[in-house]
């Protein structure tokens, strides 16, 4: 039986069995190999450490059934209209901590076979940092201040370097 991590109440984490939804024509069923925990975001949600007027309060209520934001796995089954993925392919997905997922093919990214799945799992946080670098126009500035030394902050430093920023504080 598939399992997932949920936060039933503030400060509580459990592993529960759940039933997968039926596979639709453009869906893929994925067996998760690794999921990455964003310690800042997930701890904030778990401990309800946010103000009532924030996006966290609007988006996350208890029981919180969708913990986690990124995972990698392999395709176990495909719907009849799936075009670009096949059984056995390794994929990245922005999904919750769970042993299995059923999602649209369009919500998966194929991982090349020579990429280690543990490393590929970082793709989501790298994308978050990239979006910040893009929005901050790192390609046209010489100096940037990055506040935060978590995974996203560290990846923002790497993006700043890749964009050629000379002074990274």
Regions found by a protein language model. Give the residues of each.
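Extreme N-terminal starter segment of soluble prokaryotic enzymes
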Residues: 1-3
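Residue-level recognition of beta-strand termini and adjacent short loop/turns
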Residues: 9-11, 24
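Short glycine/threonine/proline-enriched tight-turn/helix- or strand-capping micro-motif at secondary-structure
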Residues: 11-19
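Glycine-rich beta-strand-centered segment in the early N-terminal region that forms part
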Residues: 21-37, 49-95, 114
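A structural motif shared across PLP-dependent enzymes of the aminotransferase-like
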Residues: 39, 94-105
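Cytochrome P450 core scaffold surrounding the K-helix E-X-X-R motif
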Residues: 39-46
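Short, compositionally biased
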Residues: 102-115
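Mid-domain Rossmann-like dinucleotide-binding core that forms the NAD(H)/NADP(H) cofactor-binding site
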Residues: 116-169
């Amino acid at each position: 039986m598939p399992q997932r991590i949920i936060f039933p109440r503030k400060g509580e984490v459990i592993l529960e069995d759940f039933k997968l939804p039926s596979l639709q024509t453009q869906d893929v069923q994925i067996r998760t190999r690794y999921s990455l925990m964003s310690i800042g975001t997930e701890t904030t949600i778990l401990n309800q450490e946010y103000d009532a007027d924030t996006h966290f309060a609007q988006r996350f209520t208890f029981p919180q059934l969708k913990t986690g934001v990124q995972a990698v796995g392999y395709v176990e089954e495909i719907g009849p209209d799936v075009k670009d993925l096949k059984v056995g392919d390794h994929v990245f997905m922005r999904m919750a901590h769970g042993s299995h997922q059923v999602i649209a093919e369009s919500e998966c990214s194929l991982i090349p076979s020579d990429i280690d799945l543990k490393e590929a799992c970082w793709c989501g946080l790298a994308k978050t940092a990239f979006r910040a670098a893009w929005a901050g126009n790192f390609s046209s500035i010489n100096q940037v201040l990055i506040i935060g030394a978590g995974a996203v902050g560290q990846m923002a430093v790497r993006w700043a370097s890749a964009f050629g920023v000379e002074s990274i504080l």
